[in-house]
Amino acid sequence: MRLSLLLLLPLLGAWAIPGGFGDEASLTATAPELDDEEKFSTHIPTHLRCDACRAVAYQMWQHLTKAEAKLLPLDSGGRRELSESVYTDVLDQSCSQTWQGYGVGEVDQVKRLMGPGLSTGAQPSIMVMIMEGLWPTRLSKTCFHYLGEFGEDQIYEAHQQGRGTLEALLCGGPRGACSEKAPDTRTEL
């Protein structure tokens, strides 16, 4: 039964994280019910913006770190430093990627964006995640938005100070996507 669940879920556009296969208890999981905004809107829904921002920060950090690791010479501080043209290209590539592995799941009855770089604490023994739809396009647009808002230079400087600093730049602050009072830029018609 568990094997058939693992084989069936990818066909439905979702995947599961199984618990221990030696467990005798049965596991059940349901896909999160997405509303029309989550299914069809071209923007990231407000309640998922913090997760999206954190995913973007992680991907930028990951791409820049990999590019720096390819450099041989170290600067006087023992760090590898990318040239402006290289980090500009790397950041553009991080936004242009396919954004595979991201989707929406439900943790404690709360919908969350999930994927690489996004930790939601203790994970249930089985989970269904919806990965199809507009999520890759939305994440790419969000990434390019932050690239335009902060600029490559400021993003690379934050990256050099660490992943937390980069995430704080993009997502923190009083108007950041992860602030308590993040602005809702949409207006009702």
Curated annotation (Swiss-Prot):
Cysteine-cysteine disulfides: 50-178, 53-171, 95-143
Keyword Cell cycle tagged: no
Q: List this protein's GO terms for biological process.
A: integrin activation; positive regulation of cell population proliferation; positive regulation of immunoglobulin production; regulation of B cell proliferation; regulation of cell population proliferation; regulation of insulin receptor signaling pathway
Q: What is its main location?
A: endoplasmic reticulum
Localization annotation: Endoplasmic reticulum lumen; Secreted
Q: Is Ubl conjugation one of the keywords?
A: no
Motif range for Prevents secretion from ER? Answer: 186-189
* Identification of the protein by name: Marginal zone B- and B1-cell-specific protein
**High-level lineage:** Eukaryota, Metazoa, Chordata, Craniata, Vertebrata
